[in-house]
Amino acid sequence: MNRLQTIDADTLQSTAYEPVSFVVDDLLPQGLHLLAGAPKIGKSWLALWLCLCAAQGKPLWTFATRPCEVLYLCLEDSFQRIQSRLFDLTEDAPPTLHFAVMSQQLHNGLVEQIEQFLKEHPQTRLIVIDTLQRIRAAGNDANPYASDYRDIGVLKALADKHRIAILLIHHLRKMNDDDPMNMISGTTGLSGATDSNFVLRKSQRRENTATLYCTGRDIPYRELALEFDGEDHVWKLLSDNCEQTEHPSERILFLLSELLRRQPEISAPAKVLLEKIDPAGAEGLTPNSFSHRIRKSVDALRRNGITVSFRKSNGDRLICLKRADGVDDLTTENIVTIDPDNPPCFGV
């Protein structure tokens, strides 16, 4: 009998895991995602522009990206049509954006084809499959939910294994629903097993405006009002109902930068760090919410020269912060481990 592989809560909280990485900041993280919309609504234009932005490292609307290799499986198009669309978007597409118009099916060689591509192009971080139905075999399954969940599970395992984002282009039901997510074609085995779901929906078929509904495990729910520019062939952002004056990661970066200005490396419990950076409590943070903010901001902090790790010492969970520009000069004297019962004053 194979025993259950378990981990106790204390060990789990003390284990360092790589933070979730984003292809498009705050919008498209690593994992498996669905983009659904009615036929001919402009899903493929949006998908192609997303691929182009990710390959070039240019922002998608207000959301930052970093240059990476991208694979777009355009299984309902020809290379000629893709070329035409690409020229409509840019005269200078990068060689890191790759296309294919034919592939094997999901349970008959596709995974192996993608694995081989990733081996040849290890900097790939985004794969778009347009459409999901093109890679699925004709189903006569007595349990469509199980079939949907099984197919999605294979693709999710592939995305998780390689820490990449896979975006599946899919269709909507014809029946309207107050909840756009309920309009995704198929059973909840599809939408429930993905990491994020996006629905592109027009209120009227002939309109050039639409709303992109976004929900997921690693992103906040948001509704993006979009308008399709027929000349540039780009969906342009009109508004974002999730806009904030300052992103939480930016605030955490500012607070920790101030703390690390005099000491390039500090280790302390969340409560002590919070007392040092916000003694008056103006930020409205608790030690738990402060620690949570830092964990959610690890990737953003690392990109801005602050590395974060976590460890236990004498029963306390310590947040370990290191400023990158002090790495060359770090000695044991620079490392400050704060005693929670007798913390020093840093004067920040």
Regions found by a protein language model. Give the residues of each.
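Short, conserved catalytic or adaptor-binding loops enriched in Gly and charged residues
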Residues: 88-96, 187-191, 301
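DNA transaction DNA-binding modules
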Residues: 226-348
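Hydrophobic positions on the alpha1 helix immediately C-terminal to the Walker A/P-loop
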Residues: 46, 50
